[in-house]
Design a protein with these regions (language model features):
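Compact, glycine-rich, soluble single-domain proteins
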Residues: 47-88, 105-107, 112-125
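Generic secondary-structure signature for well-ordered alpha-helical cores
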Residues: 13, 71-75, 103, 132, ...
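Single conserved hydrophobic/aromatic residue that forms the stacking wall/gate
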Residues: 135-143
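C-terminal active-site-capping segments
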Residues: 129
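A glycine- and small/hydrophobic-rich beta-loop-beta segment
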Residues: 17, 21, 25-27, 37, ...
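N-terminal presequence-like segments and the immediate start of the first folded domain
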Residues: 1-27
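Acidic-glycine-rich active-site phosphate/pyrophosphate-binding loop
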Residues: 29-44, 89-105
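Short, surface-exposed charged micro-motifs
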Residues: 4-5, 86-90
Length: 143
């Protein structure tokens, strides 16, 4: 039944992939996403006048926390020692877009792509949560 899907055994049961025979290597993943907040929210974020506080600072911490919790959220994701995690931003003020970049590094037998994707998504969700009361037109895009 596996037919190339390595998260299922021959009987179709979900399994965690066996990485025990793989070599330990350096792993890096970068995920990016964006949230369209518009000019008014962008200005409030830059000025620090959002009622809920430091939007980007809180979202950065939330993203890092999301990275550390990835294996608890994604069923077949291996728990990994995270050796570096950062969340950075690019503000496109003209178009009212906040871009988030989550970089994750480890030394292990499997990659950290899911951790980077989870981190950027939690970052964007936190931004949405902190500004949505102001303007419900904010929406996000993940890539």
């Amino acid at each position: 039944m596996s037919q190339g899907f390595n998260h299922f055994d021959e009987n179709g049961n979900a399994v965690m992939v066996d990485v025990s025979g793989k070599n330990v290597t350096y792993r890096t993943a970068v995920a990016t996403g964006e949230i369209h907040v518009g000019e008014a929210i962008m200005e409030a974020v830059k000025e620090g006048s959002v009622k809920k506080g430091d939007v980007l600072g809180v979202a950065r911490v939330a993203g890092i926390m999301g990275v550390k919790r990835t294996s608890e959220l994604i069923p077949m994701c291996h728990p990994l020692p995270i050796q570096k995690c950062s969340v950075d931003y690019e503000l496109d003020e003209t178009n009212g877009i906040i871009r988030a970049f989550c970089t994750v590094k480890t030394e292990g037998k499997t990659g950290v792509e899911m951790e980077a994707l989870t981190g950027v998504q939690v970052t964007l969700l936190t931004i949405y949560d902190t500004v949505s009361y102001t303007h419900l037109r904010a929406h996000e895009t993940l890539s």
